[in-house]
Amino acid sequence: GVVSSAIGAMKGAGSAGYLLDGASNWVYRGLGEYLAQGGDLFRGTRTISTPEGDVAAGAFWLPGLSEQAAGRLSSDFGLTLTALSAAPAPDALSVVRTPRVAIYRSWRAPMPEGWTRWVLDEYGIAWQNVWDADIQGGALSEFDVVILPAQGESGIRDGNDAGSMPKQFVGGLGAEGAAALQSFVEDGGWVVAFDASVDYAISTFGLPFRNRTRGVASQDFFLPGSIIRLEVDATHPLGYGMDT
């Protein structure tokens, strides 16, 4: 069969920029291009009312977007943009800035590390790899976010065993790298841990969470490629745009 692309739309009238619902994943691909061109971007922290109807918390306001650029954004990514005749209230907005993203890459980098890079590339999000020595040497001061791709705890902490390969490829983050990550967070940075790397974050930083499947044999719990149900608080910034 033929898979049809999403069809975008332009609604409303006015010269106070455009409002973009945050529910579509492709929103972020389009916003990446807008930010790369130096546009100002804000996000609604509560429902914003327009003559075309209410838009839920998490919508993006693009005050500097021209009608021509809005049309391209709509057609290229299948998005619906609402033109505004007046700017949203300042207390209903938060400023969005392009984060400086680092992806941790160990000398035992697993396949998910490559998939993480691919996903960011698909959405036009710039990133740089950081290695053990980079983190230990203070390079995190150049970033806002560090992603720990899905990797086992020992692979991140210990890396390759001494003697198993040349010296420069041996070891992991160790205590020095863990301390650098903790200082990074304490200074306002974000660490995002995916899947198995969450175990590293929990044990290293003493987080008040527990992996309930840790230590459970695969014959007792096996969940490959499954769809599970989540309860999401769509009023929280991490849940903006999600169904409740």
Name the predicted role of every residue range.
Residues 1-244:
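Intrinsic-disorder/low-complexity accessory segments
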